[in-house]
A protein has these predicted regions:
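Glycine-rich loop(s) and the adjacent beta-strand/alpha-helix scaffold that form part
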Residues: 7-70, 271-276
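Short Gly/Pro-enriched turn/cap motifs at secondary-structure boundaries
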Residues: 37-40, 77-82, 113-114, 219-223, ...
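A glycine-rich dinucleotide-binding beta-alpha-beta segment and adjacent secondary-structure elements
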Residues: 181-264
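Short beta-alpha connecting loops at secondary-structure transitions
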Residues: 31-35, 72-78, 151-157, 262-271
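Fold-independent oxyanion-binding glycine-rich loops
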Residues: 10-11, 15-18, 53, 93-94, ...
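An anion/pyrophosphate-binding glycine-rich loop and adjacent beta-alpha core
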Residues: 47-49, 56-175
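Glycine-rich phosphate/pyrophosphate-binding beta-alpha loops
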Residues: 66-70, 106-109, 222-225, 254-272
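Core beta-strand elements of the Rossmann-like FAD/NAD(P) dinucleotide-binding domain
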Residues: 2-11, 245-246
């Protein structure tokens, strides 16, 4: 009913999760454009409480982010995925490639989207890259390209999240990419396919983009776990800006911040909020 209650205790354990449910904090610390798999309740309240107690926050710009999220609605926690098409190119808003798409691990993928202007990457491919008997995506319960690709793409095109064109130049114009740069990027990729000298060293799934129709899908990063937080002792006691223990205050779970204790490694027990 909104009544405030004061609870007195010898100690308090703050285990309020991360801030992946707060678009404001994700924009502040991580990305200009971002989606999230975090529950709506994980809004970073615990960080504000600890800052009020004098605990500085560190590594807040670290998070477990993945590539290829499609913003299908106004809710940044409701989205689709797209980056697994056979041989597809990752193109930024300047019409340029940024990585070896088939040789990228999760860290390279997240860095690619993080470094792209406005965190926007277009997944670009041609009809030649579609394998009829393959899944639309590499994971999940999707059917085959033959069954589900066309209706799914049509739904994205209607929402202004994907484009289809008969030529590379036409695709660039529809998406709003610099035509000369984009066509040169595709030409360089096709030359690499023909001569075995891909500009980014790619040697797998080298399928030339020679014949249309051509497609582009707008994608942004999506976050699963945020990895920053206050510093603490080995006993999970929170430290102030002088490195001294704030008496009676402990932290546990995602608010600890994986980056503070494990660098780029994922640590079990710090991402259980996504199970809610």
């Amino acid at each position: 009913d909104g009544t405030e209650t004061t609870l007195l205790a010898p100690a308090t354990v703050v285990c309020t999760g991360g801030y992946g449910g707060s678009e404001e904090l994700l924009n502040k610390y991580n990305f200009e454009n971002v989606l999230s798999t975090s529950p709506a309740c994980v809004t970073g309240d615990g960080y504000a409480w600890l800052e009020e107690l004098g605990a500085p926050l560190t590594n807040m710009d670290f998070c477990t982010a993945y590539a290829g999220g499609i913003p299908t609605s106004d809710d940044f926690r409701s989205f689709g995925y797209f980056n697994a098409t056979n041989g597809a190119l990752w193109i930024n808003t300047n019409g340029e490639r940024m990585a070896n798409e088939t040789g990228a691990d999760s860290h390279v993928k997240s860095e690619t989207w993080a470094n792209a202007p406005h965190n926007i990457v277009y997944t670009v491919f041609s009809s030649e890259m579609l394998i009829p008997d393959a899944k639309v995506f590499s994971t999940g319960a999707w059917g085959s390209v033959k069954e589900e690709f066309d209706p799914y793409m049509e739904s994205l095109i209607e929402k202004g999240l994907a484009w289809k064109a008969d030529t590379v130049e036409e695709l660039a114009k529809k998406v709003g990419l610099p035509v000369d740069t984009f066509t040169a990027t595709i030409a360089a990729y096709n030359d690499g396919c023909a001569n075995g000298n891909d500009p980014f060293g790619r040697t797998a799934q080298e399928v030339a983009m020679a014949n249309g129709p051509f497609y582009a899908v707008k994608t942004v990063p999506y976050v699963m776990i945020t990895c920053g937080g206050p510093m603490m002792t080995k006993d999970c006691e929170v430290l102030n800006s002088d490195g001294l223990v704030i008496e009676g205050v402990y932290i546990a779970g995602e608010i600890v911040g994986m980056a503070n204790v494990g660098g780029l490694n994922s640590i079990g027990g710090m991402g259980h909020g996504n199970c809610l």
